[in-house]
Amino acid sequence: MRILIIEDEQKLGDYLVKGLTESGFVVDLARTGPEGRNLALDGDYDLVVLDVMLPGIDGFAVLETVRKSKAMPVLMLTARDDVADRVRGLQSGADDYLAKPFAFSELLARIQALLRRGRKLHEVSSYTLP
């Protein structure tokens, strides 16, 4: 499974790469909005972990652009935890929203749940009647 992390905070980005790699995922990291948008559009990812506050363009703009052509799950991971931001993220197409600070175990559980749901939807949509 391949995950794209779009996170500008160096320590957190490196921590996520290390933890998710150790959990068996192939992980790419983008540190700006434009870089993340381009990787998400051009790459073949099973899931995106997306920060809101990014240099260049914010995570909401990245999400809206990616949603126009890609259907992979997106988990927004951000320090912006007010209700309006969570609602905006979910209405813009995010599949889940997790506020910083967070426990890595919760992030991993949410990623696994999103990937499970994604696989089930893919299996249903690719099923053909005999």
Language-model regions, residue ranges each:
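N-terminal/domain-start alpha-helical segments
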Residues: M1-K120
